[in-house]
């Protein structure tokens, strides 16, 4: 190690001596390097020293050189320094600068006919972008590109296609020109790939901190999902720092797969990148052939290379850049070209050229020297160095390295393949474990029962259980395509898995962590915590959180007929009926109406109330009201009744035909705002952890999850949460409860419920998905993911979904009202109240009838005389016999015999209680009556019917018989005599011809 500085110093001093003694040599070359490329200068001087010591190439001639440093992005300075070198006299110009200055030197070299060997240099080890130097069709292009063209676009596209990536992100550092991969971006866009770009700033820690400060939890989760597939286009130092930051901040998980592409990656960088990364890592770098014989590594033909450059164990050789290697080979190529010119004796002496003078001529030997260089070729540190017709070096090889599956942190790498522009990819990037397919492989599958993902279809004693469901269908599709078989069992604790206090995992995830199962499948969601311990395939179904609620049942209200009006309104209507009835009675009492002859009605309070009620229910009334005040009152009342009854009828129809029982909970936001319905989820599940994480996040702007967490975490989660999803579903069905769970599971339950008693609400944003879990580092993850993507693109996955979640199910998922309740014929429950009112009326009327009968019999028992019964029955006869006079001037009026006219009375039409006694009781032709006058009796002549008259014995009445009938009250009015004096009234038959005049109101019956 101490010898190297001494040798390097001696070599530098020796080469520098030749630099000063330019007048003693005929070989002089100029070099222009970027001021930051000090190592290029060191290697250049080492190469000149090695060649000057090799007497077989230049024999006695020695190479002298002049080196100058410029700003790589300052074309004017580069041209100025090149002119100084040409003025000294040079055979060739070697440059290791950026593309901006290279274009200016190209124009100068073409003008002065000086061969220009350009080695493109990348800034700080950043991947190169194409320089795009203008190439003329003529043979006067004196610039030769030593480094091969940039093939990063072709290599990345081939690798990404081999891995079947459909979505990934590209990170590039601030020094990289993104236009270098424009061709790649165009091609992947045409193939339908989803590609994102992100620039990595120099301060990586600040950039990561900004991400956490500006992104919400959902955005960070989506960002983590994007980072699962990434391409890093940056220098090795930046790549190592970036990987360390994202790993420490938990932005990537063990299932990530990153590709790093850079020509400048050396062996030391590879080991460091693998050590810092997690997951799978693929490295693409430019490689150079190395002799298999260790003793020949420092020999190239007849030339011996300095051991500091060819020994892989030498620190200087380990840290050399690719541009250093090409500079050494460039000097070697020029030395061989000079040797060829000297050997052919076609040497052209150097000339001092001036770039400033207008009449300056180019070098005459420039064309010959250029052709000699282009036709020559050497085998150096970069392999074969030669030039094609376009002046470029076509020889380039890329090496593809990758980490093996199943290796732990700090794992090694192996060579997966190589790529070159001629043959393309040589090798396979797939894991060797899957090269022979999966025929004969038996996988042990762990699951959790969850409808409709995994369900037991057959359970026969002594035989393995058979399972069915959506996840089982997906697993069968993978099995049929890849050819593997599987054995399935249920997780012992029937849980999906969550981290425990001691750092271990339980449930399905725990079975994978402890390697008791190969894969796990069910309604298993992809979460960041789970991705830290197991691998996941790409999602095969989107996931969202939903809420299961019970539909509002149609309550059996026997008095639904009263529902259209509020209780207060019913009370107002009842009070209005009583008030209007009372007002009608008072108006008639103050201004009694003049009733027509023969009217049997009376305007009592009872009749007024009955009339108002009858008109209200649109059944009419019996009392005619003729006064203007009463009619005005009744007109307003009828208008009021019309509006009220119409409104009632319309509302009753709406209440009985369309049940409006809508729930107020239609979203997660509504659920979080209310406290009447308790809600919860499965304890320690992904939903539970999801709500907890968001509810306790101080940076969460939405307070919805904070409110939900307060409800779910009551009594440390034991009050409102359940241990299994089935318990939560049963709790919803038979209690006042809302179950927060996977929307897909809840939708299946709601669709297939026999009573259609459930409905679901939730968000439509699918921020996560269901995936198949595998052991960390499993070789089956990528092949499973690729097949899942194929199922989704072909539409087969949608067919499987429709099998378990049909579009037209028997139940409506999202309506809080049963479809059967929305319309249809009315049932007995709808009108039960009407029947109850009718039954109450019937029972009440029967009770009143019994009471009236009892009262009548009790009253009749106090007048046991049969004659008194006849008097009571004859009261109705007196009302219909027009034989009483109300004239106040004749209290004891005597009636003539000719005026006696008993109106025939149709006895058959009278009710039993009012019918006359048998005609045989009146054989003595005398009618026994009482001496009272009923109130308001009218003078109306009636005629007895023939049947009634046939029962009487008509005889000649020689004289008119009289008897006491009426009494004058002390006040001059008539009143019923308190003493019912029995008197005989002789019956006087009416001639036959006079029967048709019985209805004459002017005639009466003489008594």
Swiss-Prot record:
UniProt xrefs under SUPFAM superfamilies? Periplasmic binding protein-like I, Periplasmic binding protein-like II
Site (Essential for dimerization) at: 76
- Cytoplasmic-side stretches of the chain, per the record, are 588-635, 852-1007
Which residues does the record list as glycosylated? 293, 426, 713, 716
Q: Could you tell me which Pfam families the record lists for this protein? A: ANF_receptor (PF01094), Lig_chan (PF00060), Lig_chan-Glu_bd (PF10613)
Which sequence positions carry the modification called Phosphothreonine? 886
**Which ranges form a coiled coil?**
none
A Gene Ontology biological process noted in the UniProt record is: regulation of postsynaptic membrane neurotransmitter receptor levels
Q: So what does mutating residue 954 to A actually do?
A: Loss of interaction with AP4M1
Q: Which residues lie on this side of the membrane: Extracellular?
A: 24-566, 657-830
| Chain positions found as Phosphoserine | 883, 890, 1006
Keyword DNA repair set for record:
no
Q: List the disulfide bonds.
A: 83-355, 99-131, 298-310
* Keywords carried by this UniProt record: Cell membrane, Disulfide bond, Glycoprotein, Ion channel, Ion transport, Ligand-gated ion channel, Membrane, Phosphoprotein, Postsynaptic cell membrane, Receptor, Signal, Synapse, Transmembrane, Transmembrane helix, Transport
* UniProt free text on domains: The PDZ-binding motif mediates interaction with GOPC.
Q: What is this protein called?
A: Glutamate receptor ionotropic, delta-2
Q: Which organism is it from?
A: Rattus norvegicus
Q: Which gene encodes it?
A: Grid2
């Amino acid at each position: 190690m101490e010898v190297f500085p001494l040798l390097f110093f001696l070599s530098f001093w020796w080469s520098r001596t030749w630099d000063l003694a330019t007048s003693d040599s005929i070989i002089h070359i100029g070099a222009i390097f970027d001021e930051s490329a000090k190592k290029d200068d060191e290697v250049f001087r080492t190469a000149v020293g090695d060649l000057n010591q090799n007497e077989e190439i230049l024999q006695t001639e020695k190479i002298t050189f002049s080196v100058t440093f410029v700003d790589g992005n300052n074309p004017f300075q580069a041209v100025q320094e090149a002119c100084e070198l040409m003025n000294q006299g040079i055979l060739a110009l070697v440059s290791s600068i950026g593309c901006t200055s290279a274009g200016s030197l190209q124009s100068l070299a073409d003008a002065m006919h000086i061969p220009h060997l350009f080695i493109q240099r990348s800034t700080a080890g950043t991947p190169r972008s194409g320089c795009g130097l203008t190439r003329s069709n003529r043979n006067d292009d004196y610039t030769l590109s030593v480094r091969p063209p940039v093939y990063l676009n072709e290599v990345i596209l081939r690798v990404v296609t081999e891995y079947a990536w459909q979505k990934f992100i590209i990170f590039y550092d601030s020094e990289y020109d993104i236009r270098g991969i424009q061709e790649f971006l165009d091609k992947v866009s045409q193939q339908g790939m989803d590609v994102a770009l992100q620039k990595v700033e120099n301060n990586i820690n600040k950039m990561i901190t900004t991400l956490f400060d500006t992104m919400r939890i959902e955005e960070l989760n989506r960002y983590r999902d994007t980072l699962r597939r990434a391409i890093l286009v940056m220098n090795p130092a930046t790549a190592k720092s970036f990987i360390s930051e994202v790993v420490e901040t938990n932005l990537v998980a063990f299932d990530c797969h990153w590709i790093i592409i850079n020509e400048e990656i050396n062996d030391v960088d590879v080991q460091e990148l693998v050590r810092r990364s997690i997951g799978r890592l693929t490295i693409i770098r430019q490689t150079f052939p190395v002799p298999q014989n260790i003793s020949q590594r420092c020999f190239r033909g007849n030339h011996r290379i300095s051991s500091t450059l060819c020994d892989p164990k030498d620190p200087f050789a380990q840290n050399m850049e690719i541009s250093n290697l090409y500079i050494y080979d460039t000097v070697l190529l020029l030395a061989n070209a000079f040797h060829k010119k000297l050997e052919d004796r076609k040497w052209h002496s150097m000339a001092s050229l001036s770039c400033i003078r207008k009449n300056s001529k180019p070098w005459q030997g420039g064309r010959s020297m250029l052709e000699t260089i282009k036709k020559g070729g050497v085998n150096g540190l970069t392999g074969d160095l030669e030039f094609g017709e376009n002046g470029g070096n076509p020889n380039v090889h890329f090496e593809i390295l990758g980490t093996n599956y199943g290796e732990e942190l700090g794992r090694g790498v192996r060579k997966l393949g190589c790529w070159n522009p001629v043959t393309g990819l040589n090798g396979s990037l797939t894991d060797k474990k899957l090269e022979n397919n999966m025929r004969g492989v038996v996988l042990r599958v762990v699951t959790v029962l969850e409808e409709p993902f995994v369900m037991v279809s057959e359970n026969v004693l002594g035989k393995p259980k058979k399972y069915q469901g959506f996840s089982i269908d997906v697993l069968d599709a993978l099995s049929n395509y890849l050819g593997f078989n599987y054995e399935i069992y249920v997780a012992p604790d029937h849980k999906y898995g969550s981290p425990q206090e001691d750092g271990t995992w339980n449930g399905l995830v725990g079975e994978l962590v402890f390697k008791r199962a190969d894969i796990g499948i069910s309604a298993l969601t992809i979460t960041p915590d789970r991705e830290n311990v197991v691998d996941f395939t790409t999602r095969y179904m989107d996931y969202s959180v939903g809420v299961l609620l019970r539909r509002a049942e149609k309550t059996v209200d026997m008095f639904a007929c009263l529902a259209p009006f509020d209780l207060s309104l019913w009370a107002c209507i009842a009070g209005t009926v009583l008030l209007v009835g009372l007002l009608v009675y008072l108006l008639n009492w103050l201004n009694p109406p003049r009733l027509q002859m023969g009217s049997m009605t009376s305007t009592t309070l009872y009749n007024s109330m009955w009339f108002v009620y009858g008109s209200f229910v649109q059944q009419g009334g019996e009392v005619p009201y003729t006064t203007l005040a009463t009619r005005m009152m009744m007109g307003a009342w009828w208008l009021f009744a019309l509006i009220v009854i119409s409104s009632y009828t319309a509302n009753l129809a709406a209440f009985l035909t369309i049940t409006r029982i809508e729930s107020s909970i239609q979203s997660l936001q509504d659920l979080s705002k209310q406290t009447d319905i308790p809600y919860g989820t499965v304890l320690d599940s992904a939903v539970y952890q999801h709500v907890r994480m968001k509810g306790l996040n101080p940076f969460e702007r939405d307070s919805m999850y904070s409110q939900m967490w307060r409800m779910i975490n009551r009594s440390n989660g034991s009050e409102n949460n359940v241990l299994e999803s089935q318990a939560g579903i049963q709790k919803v069905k038979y209690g006042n409860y809302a179950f927060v769970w996977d929307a897909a599971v809840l939708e299946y339950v709601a669709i297939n419920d026999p009573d259609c008693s459930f409905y679901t609400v939730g968000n439509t944003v699918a921020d996560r998905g269901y995936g198949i879990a595998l052991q960390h580092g499993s070789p089956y993850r990528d092949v499973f993911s690729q097949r899942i993507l194929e199922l989704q693109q072909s539409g087969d996955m949608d067919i499987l979904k429709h099998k378990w979640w049909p579009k037209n199910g028997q139940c409506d998922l999202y309506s809080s009202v049963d479809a059967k309740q929305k319309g249809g014929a009315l049932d007995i429950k709808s009108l039960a109240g009407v029947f109850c009112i009718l039954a109450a009326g019937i029972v009440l009327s029967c009770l009143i009838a019994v009471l009236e009968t009892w009262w009548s019999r009790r009253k009749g028992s106090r007048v046991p005389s049969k004659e008194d019964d006849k008097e009571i029955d004859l009261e109705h006869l007196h009302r219909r016999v027009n034989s009483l006079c109300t004239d106040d001037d004749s209290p004891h009026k005597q009636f003539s015999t000719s005026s006696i006219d008993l109106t025939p009375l149709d006895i058959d039409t009278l009710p039993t209680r009012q019918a006359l006694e048998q005609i045989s009781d009146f054989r003595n032709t005398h009618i026994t009556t009482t001496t009272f006058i009923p109130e308001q009796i009218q003078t109306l002549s009636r005629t007895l019917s023939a049947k009634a008259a046939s029962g009487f014995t008509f005889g000649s009445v020689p004289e008119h018989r009289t008897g006491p009938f009426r009494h004058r009250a002390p006040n001059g009015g008539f009143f019923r005599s308190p003493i019912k004096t029995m008197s005989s009234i002789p019956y006087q038959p009416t001639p036959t011809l006079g029967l048709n005049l019985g209805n004459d109101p002017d005639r009466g019956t003489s008594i």
